[in-house]
């Protein structure tokens, strides 16, 4: 069972147990509180398959965070529009009634102007000190051993991502391997306070058996076994540690946002692991207010596409199963469906496919033909991330609530 099954159970949990709540968008939600999802990265890259996901948008937003960027122009230029509504709402609130010299702009016109007018984009495309600013340039009161001088602003800032990488390389057993986006002193300057507000990484040493397996020597015995072990032990290119990532999220738009968040933090884990030569091990999400917007409920049901047990029963082919069906006790929907699950009878018209893989290209050649390694801090481009063997069901459209 991988994280997609956890996700589908979460949708079902909200539909069955969610309480109605009002929210800042005025849409209304059904909500549960305090859930956790987990995924072992060796089961595949956790990009949902029960609906088609926008891979390029996931990569683009994460690189936007890692650049320390807070202006949507980078996103818009790369056809990623998940923050359009927040920027447009900010524009509407902060412009006068006539929108100054711009006239009345529809959201589509606003986004086109962001794309084509650099001066306009600089003024109205910025979302305030959101994720990227906090990850890469958290303002501190003065100079300390963690801070650097930001020449653009003149402030002393802390580059949390750079510090995290340095700590992973020098003190991987630290319990302070954290990055935080919840800067209380700057929340009122943000167009939208962070929903996923922080993450922590954890590392452990790999066993000799795990390193042998990574090197392709699993199960090797005989005369040369000790020599192979010594070779693997001395080979520093074979990772010596596994790394896991856990993120915390206060507000979870379960239908649209959470699938993005899962894939984004999984990709971040892959990038960091590659940077510090560790093996991505486990991804964990701690989720607070876990909700479905009321205008996403039908879409969630479509994604689940649960098949009633009476239809599932007709898929039985083994004569002994057909005979024993009537002896299920207690004869309740829950027990019947569990019995059918054990016999691998499809429970949904959108059964999950095997998860894909992600390949990261961190090698490059400079203008002088000299090879170099790209860094999580500044080097990656959208084209450096290749999604392999991704098979999915059709997309399910739903409105973005701002």
Residue spans for each PLM region:
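Terminal, non-catalytic protein-protein interaction segments that mediate quaternary/complex assembly
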Residues: 1-402
